[in-house]
A protein has these predicted regions:
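HAD-like aspartate-dependent phosphatase fold
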Residues: 1-141
Length: 141
């Protein structure tokens, strides 16, 4: 399911001549396995999540947005933890690059092309490997 959305995103961007696409990433149940503990951030990555996120960080055509309901102090801890693995995000819970336009109002719901979130059906145990294979096919020209 997620690979179809990503493939469609790449095809659409190519047809439209977009220089960038916007991907939103949840933390719990998506990048990291949830630990269900208060005052202790999750630290167990799903298989292939680190490799994929590092690949995405090398691409200038993908803007990475951290999409999380974590508390601000937890977000800081997650950003520090991710940074140890070379995983960085361009924005947190916002996309200031896409302003309101003829197609949508983006002040209350930010714009993205791809959403990776367990609540949207993302399966951290299987989807990262599928994304890894897909990204190897969609290299930057």
């Amino acid at each position: 399911m997620i690979t179809k959305a990503i493939d469609n995103c790449f095809q659409h961007a190519k047809r439209r001549g977009w220089a960038k696409t916007y991907w939103a990433f949840d933390v719990h149940g998506t990048i990291l396995r949830p630990n269900y503990k208060t005052n202790q951030i999750s630290k167990e990555f799903y298989p292939h999540a680190v490799n994929v996120m590092q690949m995405l960080n090398r691409r200038k055509d993908i803007v990475k947005i951290l999409y999380t309901c974590s508390y601000p102090h937890e977000i800081e801890q997650y950003l520090e933890y991710f940074d140890q693995y070379g995983i960085r995000f361009d924005y947190i819970n916002t996309n200031p690059e896409v302003a309101d336009g003829g197609y949508g109002y983006y002040k209350d719901k930010f714009y993205f092309n791809v959403l990776l979130d367990d609540k949207a059906g993302f399966d951290g145990d299987t989807d990262w490997e599928e994304i890894l294979s897909l990204l190897k096919k969609h290299t930057i020209d």
